[in-house]
Amino acid sequence: MTILLVGLGAALGAILRYQLTRIGNHIASEFPLMTFLINLTGSFCLGWLTGSQLSQPVTLFLGVGVLGGYTTFSTLNSELSQLWFRRRYHIFFGYWLLTYGLGLLVAAAGFYAGL
Amino acid sequence: MKIKESLAVGSFAFFGGILRYLIGLVLNQPTGFPYGTLCVNLIGAFCLPFLMRYIVARLHLSDQLALAIGTGFFGAFTTFSSFSVDAIRLVNQQQWSAFAWYVGISMVGGVLLSLLADYWAVKLTHNPEEQEVSQ
């Protein structure tokens, strides 16, 4: 049962990420803005969810499922690798440092907002 | 809306998310080091670029299947939100060295594995002998 909650949540989260990324494709920018925003908003929400300590099924569905499926680590690094191979070093380092720096910051902000 | 593509992404993400959860159950320690999240993230960081730039061309996968496996399965298998919240938990528990190792390995290891996968994919694609074998 918990497995189904996680799976369904992940499916919803991934579809949301896919639709947002499609919208983002219309923005002509070399900076992967959509993945960036998805990972930051997801980190904030999971921080909030963790801080507010809701019941286990809700946390599993929303946290492990929806937000786990919504945010992504593989696309982030794949985009970084592409920026490196295209020699866009400024964007590479900007995207890399901003994602991790702000990601940790908003996760902490979400956590304390949820307490 | 791309309903068909969305359903393909969602159904593969269903399994990606479940696999991440199961690996986390086995490897993550509630008060310790998030080995499970680190493990799925590093595997995904290598597999996604290698899939998109080598396997798709080699096996002539359709765009829709590539999208389902890449954006759906590997996108949901890996996670950034658990990474950042796990890291904040280590800070709250004042496990400074675990925090530094976790963030360091994720930050550097993730991008190195993607670079390696891309590099290897390009090398395999442009190697004439390799193409000979495949015929």
UniProtKB/Swiss-Prot annotation, chain A:
Q: Which Pfam families match?
A: CRCB (PF02537)
In its UniProt entry, what is this protein called? Fluoride-specific ion channel FluC 2
Whether Membrane counts among this entry's keywords is yes
Query: From which organism does this entry originate?
Result: Latilactobacillus sakei subsp. sakei (strain 23K) (Lactobacillus sakei subsp. sakei)
Q: Please list the GO terms describing molecular function.
A: fluoride channel activity; metal ion binding
Q: What does the similarity note say?
A: Belongs to the fluoride channel Fluc/FEX (TC 1.A.43) family.
Taxonomic placement: Bacteria, Bacillati, Bacillota, Bacilli, Lactobacillales
Which residues are listed for Na(+) binding in this entry?
Answer: G68, T71
**Which biological processes are named by the entry's GO terms?**
cellular detoxification of fluoride
UniProtKB/Swiss-Prot annotation, chain B:
Write out the entry's keywords from A to Z. Answer: Cell membrane, Ion channel, Ion transport, Membrane, Metal-binding, Sodium, Transmembrane, Transmembrane helix, Transport
Cellular component terms, GO, for this chain's entry? plasma membrane
User: Where do transmembrane segments lie in this chain?
Assistant: 7-27, 32-52, 65-85, 96-116
Keyword Acetylation appears in the UniProt entry: no
Reaction catalysed by this chain? fluoride(in) = fluoride(out)
Q: Which GO terms describe its biological process?
A: cellular detoxification of fluoride
Q: Which residues bind Na(+)?
A: G75, T78
Activity regulation: the record says: Na(+) is not transported, but it plays an essential structural role and its presence is essential for fluoride channel function.
Task: Give all cystine bridges in this chain.
Answer: none
Q: Which InterPro entries match?
A: FluC
Family statement: Belongs to the fluoride channel Fluc/FEX (TC 1.A.43) family.
Descriptive protein name: Fluoride-specific ion channel FluC 1
User: What gene is it encoded by?
Assistant: fluC1
